[in-house]
Amino acid sequence: MNTYAIWVNLAPGAKDLELVAAVNAYLGALQHEGTVESWSVQRRQFGFGPSELGEFMIQIRTQNLTQLEAAFTHAARRSGEMERLHVEVYSRVQDFRSGLYRDFPDAVRVS
């Protein structure tokens, strides 16, 4: 399993519950397309965490990098309903940071 981790802060004037609803709508559409397995949205608690990373962490899980690339391809088209859903997310955030992780050790690890 691969995890695309995203850290963001709310953009000025954005509301936290609206961001979560937008993320759920967008990633739900990607899941319906078969390009995302699951996701979670988490919020920093009590201010604990590195200041470089945002208050919100979004973890998007895919079976493999091929599936993740398909999700990126949907976003890259920048048209239609998928773009409308994407705008609903990124218009509410700032200070975007991301990372890519995988389960470890993975199935191909020999030693």
Where do the protein language model's features map onto the residues?
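Structural beta->alpha junctions
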Residues: 10-14, 62-64
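An amphipathic, aromatic/His-enriched active-site/gating alpha helix that lines ligand/cofactor pockets
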Residues: 29-37, 51-53, 59-100
